[in-house]
Amino acid sequence: MNEDLMKHLAPRPGRYPLLPELSPRAEVALICRMLFHEGYDDHIAGHITVLQPDGTLLVNPWELAWDEITAADVLRVDAAGKVLEGEWNVTPAIGLHLAVHAARDDVKVIVHNHSRFGTLWANAKRVPPVYDQTSAQVDGDIAVFDEYGGTVDDAAESNAAVAALGDRKWALLANHGVFVVANDLRQAHLRCLTLEWRCRQAWHMEALGAGHPMPQAVADRTGAMIDGNGFPFLFEAMARREIRLDPSVLEG
């Protein structure tokens, strides 16, 4: 978030803090639930990794659906994926995450799932057009990785996916799902919901058989501004919703 810009745009303190103080594990549990309600809801599939200052990673457990995870359930693993803290197990498909974290110093958060509309476009091996402002909240090309062999726990396949991603923010994994990287949790949340919204809106527009994509220059300018500066208060609002729905998300 661009703090200097926020001081100018939102100088008033508000009536109360937007969120309670959250532990890193609580933030992971919250984003799991937030994204579940944005369409990242393929049962127990999908994984989120968050790089910590000591080089370890926080990751959701293999056994649990994203909408039931609490802070106490979140695992800590080392750079090789070995569980250091936690009572659950880590998915064997964590290899792609580990490879990207190792290859890119700018990536602190990685999200992978088989989102409802993102996976449709991944199956079509097509990048969805941008039709509206919300779809344009994030700029940059979407990579399409078209070498899926049925798993991403193979080192060679993970390395190929890393190469296909390059320095991009997101990718469609053909016949599989979506893959999003970010510098922090708030940016990851914005990028994930923007990708799924964009995929959903484009699907509906194609079903309608009408509509005109946003001019590329306008989409690029919009995305550079919003993704570059952050979307004020969005993460906090969606996190509060999850806490209202189930305060136990913060337990642990």
Predicted regions and their residues:
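Glycine-rich flexible loops
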Residues: M1-G252
